[in-house]
């Protein structure tokens, strides 16, 4: 038995499912998870001393790779002065100013501890600011595990939210409305049905938890127009896309300004973090300036602020995102070439340092159902075979992957060689 397997069995006796976040348990691909002990650059090393090219990147935060010297130095400098004070620090101002200077829609920003906190607070703020209760989310878009946002889509066009986990009363999600991503008509119908009741529309501008879905520009523009028409707020959940797909987030790439933006991952440089920001008059509705309450013991803690600030300074450098995008494109092209050589249907897409792929003969993937209809059995086989070759992709067909600035031509070539070997083996099996 490997040490990884031994640790997993031990973990299951003391931690529910043996993990502290469900996707890590490999339920989406079967088998047992790998336990890691270290990371450096584009690589992870497991507890059995096997090395992997890492395309998970701690689920997005590590855009500079593991243990980037500038981030380590920044954290080390702060660490010896104090890890948390529960009081304001200058670093909070510095990171807030840096984010506001880069993110087009943000005039004021509040730091929290996770993406879940950020989206939960954003919904509360939107409801408080508009004095309305209902909101629209999209099937397959994940916004953390707060009760009102953890909703499974119903079968009807205008179905009210149904909790997707025990422990959430129907009364909590009765104000959650759902629609299909990239389907503006469904959103318009929801507004027509509830013209005075919808506080906000929340979405990942590029969903990363139902694969990797690029939005139709007309869809995003239409959402902005509908929100303006019905006096609702538009929330972009850029926890994943913020500073990952471009220096100014997805909103900068697409030229759409939301009223509220939620952030996380990269702005903490690998430390736990979250944030929400937006128009001055909306953000001023948060306590202690306004009536909408939000608080957090470790919000704005110095370690996360230092790591985030160091990360943002690095990604501001000339050609950073051009180089990152080129590397990511090379990766998806390499995977597509390997699949084509094996005559296996395959679709991949990428933007900035974010990508996704699935085994399908579709020429485009536009929503959750498109991803769900792809070949999940083949994905599972591919995942495990690539893992055996030392390539670590996300252990779920529905999760996006991530490339860091430390990935280069060598890693792409190794990945291509492994994929070509694996796909030919799977084709002939």
UniProtKB/Swiss-Prot annotation:
The modification N6-(pyridoxal phosphate)lysine is found at residue 265. It catalyses: (S)-4-amino-5-oxopentanoate = 5-aminolevulinate. Its cofactor is pyridoxal 5'-phosphate. Keywords: Cytoplasm, Isomerase, Porphyrin biosynthesis, Pyridoxal phosphate. The keyword Isomerase applies. Its EC number is 5.4.3.8. Gene3D superfamilies: Aspartate Aminotransferase, domain 1, Type I PLP-dependent aspartate aminotransferase-like (Major domain). One of its GO terms (cellular component) is cytoplasm. Pathway: Porphyrin-containing compound metabolism; protoporphyrin-IX biosynthesis; 5-aminolevulinate from L-glutamyl-tRNA(Glu): step 2/2. SUPFAM superfamilies: PLP-dependent transferases. This is Glutamate-1-semialdehyde 2,1-aminomutase. It comes from Legionella pneumophila subsp. pneumophila (strain Philadelphia 1 / ATCC 33152 / DSM 7513).
């Amino acid at each position: 038995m490997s040490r990884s397997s031994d640790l997993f069995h031990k973990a299951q006796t003391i931690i529910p499912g043996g993990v502290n976040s469900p996707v890590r348990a490999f339920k989406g691909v079967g088998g047992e998870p790998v336990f890691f002990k270290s990371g450096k650059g584009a690589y992870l090393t497991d507890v059995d001393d096997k090395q992997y090219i890492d395309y998970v990147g701690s689920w997005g935060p590590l855009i500079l790779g593991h243990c980037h010297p500038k981030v380590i130095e920044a954290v080390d400098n702060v660490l010896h002065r104090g890890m948390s004070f529960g009081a304001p620090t200058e670093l909070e101002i510095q990171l807030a100013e840096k984010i506001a200077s880069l993110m087009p829609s943000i005039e004021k920003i509040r730091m929290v501890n996770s993406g879940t906190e950020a989206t939960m607070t954003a919904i509360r703020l939107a409801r408080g600011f508009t004095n309305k209760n209902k909101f629209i989310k999209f099937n397959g878009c994940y916004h953390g595990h707060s009760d009102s946002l953890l909703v499974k889509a119903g079968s009807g066009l205008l179905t009210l939210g149904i909790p997707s986990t025990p422990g959430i009363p129907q009364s909590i999600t009765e104000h959650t409305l759902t629609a299909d991503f990239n389907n503006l008509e469904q959103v318009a119908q929801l507004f027509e049905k509830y013209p005075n009741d919808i506080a906000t529309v929340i979405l990942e501008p590029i969903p990363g938890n139902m694969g990797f879905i690029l939005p139709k520009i007309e869809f995003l523009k239409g959402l902005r127009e509908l929100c303006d028409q019905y006096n609702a707020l538009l929330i972009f959940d850029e926890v994943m896309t913020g500073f990952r797909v471009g220096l100014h987030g997805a909103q900068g790439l697409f030229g759409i300004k939301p009223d509220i933006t939620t952030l996380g991952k990269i702005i903490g440089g690998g430390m736990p973090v979250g944030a929400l920001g937006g128009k001055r008059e909306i953000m001023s509705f948060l306590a202690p300036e306004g009536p909408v309450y939000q608080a957090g013991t470790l919000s704005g803690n110095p370690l996360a602020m230092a790591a985030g600030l160091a990360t943002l300074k690095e990604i501001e450098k000339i050609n950073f995102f051009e180089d990152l995008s080129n590397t990511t494109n090379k990766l998806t092209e390499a995977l597509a070439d390997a699949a084509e050589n094996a005559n296996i249907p395959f679709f991949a897409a990428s933007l900035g340092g974010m990508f996704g792929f699935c085994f399908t003969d579709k020429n485009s993937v536009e929503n959750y159902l498109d991803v769900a209809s792809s070949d999940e059995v083949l994905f599972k086989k591919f995942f495990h075979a690539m893992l055996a070759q030392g390539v670590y992709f996300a252990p779920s067909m529905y999760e996006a992957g991530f490339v860091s600035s430390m990935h280069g031509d060598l890693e792409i070539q190794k990945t291509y060689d492994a994929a070509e070997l694996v796909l030919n083996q799977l084709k002939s099996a």
